[in-house]
Amino acid sequence: TYNYSLTNNFTDINKLAQGYVFSNYNSLFSGNRYLENSTSQVHSLRYFKYNMFNFENIFATVSYSKQVDAIKNKSLLTGVNQVSSAVNINSAFADESLSGSGNYGRSFAKYYKANVRASLNWNKFNNIRVYPDSDANPNNNPTEIQTTESFNHSYTIGFSTNYKTIPNLGLSYNYSISDNFSDVIYTDSP
């Protein structure tokens, strides 16, 4: 099954109000009347098969999403004080995510089941970094787009019994890797 959606995302009306608003005792928010909606599109593909004769099941899904002209906050930190403003980020810096997973399982020898599972997830997010200058207005300070990426994948293999009158036993092993392009974390779990 393939699904596609295109959605317009509108901001909160408070972000459009011109002027400064106290968010906290040391935090101001400056509205931006020129904000526009952002657009997000999602593509997803799903497959499922189940066989009743050998209890085989196959499941797979893939999903991709992209948000264009996203509304981001840019914040200027001066000491413990903060002045924030919302802006539309350039469409060349779209937030994207891609995820996929698959599972295969089946019964064999009447009382035993085994399955294999894998999942992948990639994300790319763009944020605005504001550098301080001589004034406290975040709208005219030098900025830079910072891109953050992460890639996580996980693999699982499992085995279990399928008795009707005695207790069942299940064993599984999971191996996962989390990579945010500055640190890599490996996890083994029985």
Give the residues covered by each predicted segment.
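Exposed, low-structure sequence patches enriched in small/polar residues
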Residues: 1-190
